[in-house]
Each structure stands twice: as C-alpha cells, then as structure tokens.
From Swiss-Prot:
Its cofactor is Mg(2+). This is Ribulose bisphosphate carboxylase large chain. Pfam families: RuBisCO_large, RuBisCO_large_N. GO terms for molecular function: magnesium ion binding; monooxygenase activity; ribulose-bisphosphate carboxylase activity. PANTHER family: RIBULOSE BISPHOSPHATE CARBOXYLASE, RIBULOSE BISPHOSPHATE CARBOXYLASE LARGE CHAIN. It comes from Silene gallica (Common catchfly). The gene is rbcL. The basic functional RuBisCO is composed of a large chain homodimer in a 'head-to-tail' conformation. In form I RuBisCO this homodimer is arranged in a barrel-like tetramer with the small subunits forming a tetrameric 'cap' on each end of the 'barrel'.
Amino acid sequence: SVGFKAGVKDYKLTYYTPEYETLDTDILAAFRVSPQPGVPPEEAGAAVAAESSTGTWTTVWTDGLTSLDRYKGRCYHIEPVAGEENQYICYVAYPLDLFEEGSVTNMFTSIVGNVFGFKALRALRLEDLRIPVAYVKTFLGPPHGIQVERDKLNKYGRPLLGCTIKPKLGLSAKNYGRAVYECLRGGLDFTKDDENVNSQPFMRWRDRFLFCAEAIYKSQAETGEIKGHYLNATAGTCEEMIKRAVFARELGVPIVMHDYLTGGFTANTSLAHYCRDNGLLLHIHRAMHAVIDRQKNHGMHFRVLAKALRLSGGDHIHAGTVVGKLEGEREITLGFVDLLRDDFTEKDRSRGIYFTQSWVSTPGVLPVASGGIHVWHMPALTEIFGDDSVLQFGGGTLGHPWGNAPGAVANRVALEACVQARNEGRDLAREGNTIIREACKWSPELAAACEVWKEIKFEFQAMDTI
C-alpha cells in the first residue's frame, strides 16, 4: 500500500485544535474571518492557520519527511463577532521555529502572505499579533527610543512640536531651507520633509540636505534650543537610501526620515541599524498604510503595522490625530499609541488589544499626531497624547496670516499654555478653549491664528464602516 493517503482532506482535521494550550514562544494572531457562504468557521479558521504556515491544498508525500505537529500553525479558538453575520475572530498560534530571527519581512510573508487571496474566505483581516519575548529579543527595535531622544534634545515635560514643509512639491532647495529656518526660529522643535519629497528634478536631495542643515544650525544658534529637520532618506534602492543617511550624518544633523511601508521592512530595518550605529534619530512616515488598514473586514489593522515598526525600528511614527482631518477613533488609537510607547500592554478588547504584549525593554516609539490640526486642537491633543508625543502642524503653522515664524510662535505658545494649565491641575477637556483664549491676550501671533481657524472642522462619517 502507498505510504500516505493521497487526496484532498479538510483543513480542520489537522489545523483546528481547540484543546491546544499556547506556548510562551508562540506567535499568536487574531484574524477577523468572513467565510464564503456554506464554509463552516472551523474550516475557515483552520484554512487560515494552514495556508499561513505548513499547509497546502492537498496531501503531499514529503509531509512524511517532517514533523507537522512541530511546525504547523494551529487555530485554537474561534468566537463570533457580535453584530456581524457570519464573521468570526479566529485565533491562530504559530510555532516560533517557522520564522527567521530579526526579520519582520519573513514574519509578514508567512502570516499575511498568500492566505489573503484564499478563495474559501470572502475577506480576512489581521487584527492583532502577540510577539513572544523570545522573538522580540531577536530585533534591535527603535534606534534610540523616547528617553534617549529627550536626552539628546534636552527637552522634557512636554510634547514635541513639528511642522511639515508645504507646498510639499515644487519649492527650490534654498526656499525650502528658508521655510525650515523660519519655523524652527519661531519655536518648533522639528520640521519635516513631506513623505513624497525624495529627490525630484526641482530639488535634488543633496541640495535640500545642505540648505536644511544650514537652517538647523542658524536657528539653534539664535534660540539656544536643539533643532531638527526630518531629512527623508527614502530612495529607489537600499544603497541610495544609506548613502543619503551617511550624508546626513556627515552634516551632523540629529534625525533622518523613512517611508517604511513604501520603502519596505528590509530597507527600514537596515536604516534603523545604521541610525543606531551612528547616533541618528529615525522618523517614520506611514504612507500607504490606509491601503492596508482602512477597511474593517479585510487587510491588517494599523496596530499590527505599528508593532512591526517597533520591531523593525523607528523613533517616531505617525499614528493619527483623533481630532484632525485624518480619521482615528479615540480608544482604538490610544490602544496602539500605548503599544508603541509602553513596555507592557494588557489585553483590552475595548481598545482593540487582543493580546497582552511585553516588549522586554525594547525602546519605545513616539507617536506623531499630524493632519489637519491647528491651535484650537492643542488642549485636546495635549490631553489625549500626553507628553510623549510629537504634534505636527503643517498648514496649521505655514497657513498663519503673518507667515511661518509667527505660525510657529502661535503653536509653541498654545502648547506651553496647555502644558502649564495641565500642570496646575486644570481640566483641558472642559477648559481648553478658555486656556487658549487667555493665552491669546499676551500673544498676538496666537490671537491671529485663533481667528483664522476658529470655524474649521473636518467632520465626515467614519470611513471604516464600508
């Protein structure tokens, strides 16, 4: 007789194991599974476990050459999603042996690879991952982290302020550097290259780096504060990216920037290693994230991309605002903000956190609030994000009627007023507008900003109901 039974068999016979007790070394995943009509949830969950680990669609004789029990993913728990018809959260455990050490790329290729095109599922979304400490320890993580960044910048007890230079495309390098100088001189801590500023014909990267470095040093000398500009090192090849980072280091600037999703995790991890070795901070922009995370039934939740970034490495990452033009629901946003900053996060389904996660002292990442925010939002932002954050006002600085430097002054005054009020025990949520109005009395720059933006609101239905 043949040594194995050929043919197609149900995934659930091998990969659905409700009695399995998860190991501390397993990578755990929570998938939101929408099976095709007629496909039972156990089969759908088992199919996800199989296709993202050792399985294939039919029995193969080479299965006999290995121990499936040792290497297979297991769907160990399934629960229906309240309020949704035929949708389930399927929990899958993956043995650690399946993954290459220190490679986010390999982890994602397995867990969110082919399985997302699987025909038995209408849709599939990865909601959360539990990264075991044994795997966390194979990554360097953020180049420096929150505490080291504060020590490098000598800035404590308040959020940091940034500004994206606009118009994002079309300025010459010298005019760009001038805008950087004005913002930093006015009182911001950082300015930022837009994510799509790389090295275009109207402004090559080397010219931009030089003029921005000049702006940094001039504003530092005049204000006595340490300043930075996120020089975007993202490039078409990894070699070119590192070349740009090397030039930034030679200029002596404090921070560079990378678009980690369009650039890719392999490139990002290389850059993070370079930044740690050379004392550069690394600002991460999440361009392309909404392609992956915006639909609630398919793709990947941003909290997974945030965890992946903390492993791959970055000191800042954009994380939504809760209040501006880009969406983000408060509790869910705060859930992944805590995942970025804290060393230990408890499971809390109300905040979208499916697993308890320990980071074994991997440095934290500063969340960046950016997108359609202005001075009237300052009390809410200070309250929601706390001190360990970067608040970035692009149009909210450069749109000031008197120019860039007064725009920066307005933001800095508003921030200092909110921090002082909070430290005095006032309630920012209730008294926010009053605090800003009081500060307007002694800051004409802030008063002018408040007048311009008093009516602006970005209020639409939440998008992820599609």
